[in-house]
């Protein structure tokens, strides 16, 4: 099975759930950029302090800072890994790739979890978060598609993209992902 992976997909597609399952089953390091940022901030590392200052101003953490945090995690990693939540844009991907080449850890596969909007909206509303109403969700999906479509094409052109239908049980989706990575 391929060992250096990216997960892409719209909000509600099950990326986090499937990433956790796959990482546990195959001893891959799960790199969720949101979790990594929170861990760096909590540990009060120099990168974490820089991120905290930006976040406390209500601003987005720069691509460069996220890349530095990802590099920090990968530079001593000899096993496999799964990046979840980064890159989200073509600009981020083109910044990430030279770093991975330098570390001699190129991406081996990109899993795109696809799901129709009706199911996505239903899943997200059922989570019960206060900001998950249909209008907000539709906007998030539109932003996702606008930002991520070029990224999907980029990885398709590189021959890395594996598309998995993310409708069904957690188990059946996990099996489909595993098959796509062999």
UniProtKB/Swiss-Prot annotation:
Keyword Nucleotide-binding: yes
GO terms of molecular function: adenylate kinase activity; ATP binding
Main location as per UniProt: cytoplasm
Region (NMP), start-end ranges: 32-61
UniProt key word Nucleotide-binding: yes
Gene Ontology cellular-component annotations: cytoplasm
Coiled-coil regions listed in the entry: none
Signal peptide: none
Involved pathway(s): Purine metabolism; AMP biosynthesis via salvage pathway; AMP from ADP: step 1/1
Stretch list, region LID: 126-132
SUPFAM superfamilies the UniProt entry points to: P-loop containing nucleoside triphosphate hydrolases
Subunit record text: Monomer.
Domain notes: Consists of three domains, a large central CORE domain and two small peripheral domains, NMPbind and LID, which undergo movements during catalysis. The LID domain closes over the site of phosphoryl transfer upon ATP binding. Assembling and dissambling the active center during each catalytic cycle provides an effective means to prevent ATP hydrolysis.
Purpose: Catalyzes the reversible transfer of the terminal phosphate group between ATP and AMP. Plays an important role in cellular energy homeostasis and in adenine nucleotide metabolism.
HAMAP family found in the cross-reference section: Adenylate_kinase_Adk
NCBIfam families for the chain: PRK00279.1-3 (NF001381), PRK14527.1 (NF011100), PRK14531.1 (NF011104), PRK14532.1 (NF011105)
Protein name according to UniProt: Adenylate kinase
Organism for this UniProt entry: Prochlorococcus marinus (strain MIT 9303)
């Amino acid at each position: 099975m391929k060992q250096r992976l990216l997960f892409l997909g719209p909000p509600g597609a099950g990326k986090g759930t499937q990433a956790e399952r796959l990482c546990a089953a195959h001893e891959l390091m799960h790199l969720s950029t949101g979790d990594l940022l929170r861990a760096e901030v909590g540990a009060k590392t120099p990168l974490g302090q820089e991120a905290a200052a930006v976040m406390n101003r209500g601003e987005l953490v720069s691509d460069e800072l996220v890349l530095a945090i990802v590099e920090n995690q990968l530079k001593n990693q000899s096993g496999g890994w799964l990046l979840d939540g980064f890159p989200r844009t073509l600009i981020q991907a083109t910044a990430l790739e030279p770093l991975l080449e330098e570390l001699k850890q190129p991406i081996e596969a990109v899993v795109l979890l696809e799901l129709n909007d009706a199911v996505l909206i239903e899943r997200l509303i059922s989570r019960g978060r206060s900001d998950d109403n249909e209008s907000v969700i539709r906007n998030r999906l539109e932003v996702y598609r606008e930002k991520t479509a070029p990224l999907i094409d980029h990885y398709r052109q590189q021959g890395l993209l594996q598309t998995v239908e993310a409708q069904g049980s957690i188990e059946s989706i996990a099996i489909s992902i595993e098959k796509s990575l062999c």
